[in-house]
Amino acid sequence: MLLMHKVLLRILFLIPVIGYANDPFEEINREVWTFNEGVDNRIARPVAEFYDDVVPIPVQSSITNFFSNLDEIDNSINQLLQGKPVAAGNDFARFLVNTTFGFLGFFDVASIMGLEEHDEDFGQTLGVWGVPTGPYLMLPFYGPSSPRDLVGRPISGVLSGTFSIEESDVRLSITALDALETRARLLDVESLIVGDKYTFIKNSYLQYSEFEVQDGEEIEDDFTDDMDDFLLDD
C-alpha cells in the first residue's frame, strides 16, 4: 500500500540518527537472518521480481488495494480498542465503500472520497496500552518480530478478512499471494539499505513499530527537528 511506502521512506531517513540496542539474542538472530536471506535469495526475491516484471502496475495496485481492504475490519476494531472511535468509523466506512463500490476492494474509492487510510493491528494496540516491545526477534521465514508482535499479529490475523474464508485451499492461496505482493513492494526499498543489512533492518523494524504505536506524532516531530538542524547547519 502507498501508506506503508511513505512511512518506510520517512523511517529510512531517521535510521542514521536514531539507534536501538534491544537485541540480547543477536547471535541467534543473525543465524536466523542468514537462513532467511538464503531462502529469500533463492526463492522469495526471484518470484517477487518475476511478479513485478510480468504483472502490470495497475493490476499490482488493484491487488494491493484488495489486501488493504481485507485489513480494514482489523483496523477499525483496533482503533476502537485504542480509544479512537472516529478513526474506527473512518476505517469501517472505507471497508464498506471499497467493498461495495470498489469491486471487493480492488479499487480504492474511499481515498478518492477523502477517507484516510490507516494501518493498525493488535500489536500496536498492546503498545498503546503500555505493553513494551520487548527484545528484537528474527523468526525463521517470517523475519523481524518482537514478543509484543508475536501476541498481536495472530489476533489481527483472526480479525482479517482472509481468516473468515472457509475453503482452506482458497485461504492458503490468498495468503500466499498476499506474501508475494508484500515482498514485491519491498523491492524498491531494498536499494536504499546501507551498511550492515541486519542492523539496518532491525533498526527499521523497531523504529517503524514505534512510529505505528505513536501514530507518527512523536517521530514526525523528531524528523522535523532533525531536518531543521540539518538545514540550519548548511
Residue ranges and their predicted role:
Residues 12-21:
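Hydrophobic h-region of N-terminal signal peptides that target proteins for export
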Residues 23, 124, 129-234:
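A structured, mid-to-C-terminal "fold-capping" secondary-structure block
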Residues 50-55, 78-88:
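Helix-loop segments that flank and shape redox-cofactor active sites
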Residues 59-62, 82-92, 111-112, 191, ...:
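Surface-exposed patches in mature extracellular/periplasmic domains of secreted proteins
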Residues 69, 82-144:
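Mid-length scaffold segments of soluble, non-membrane domains
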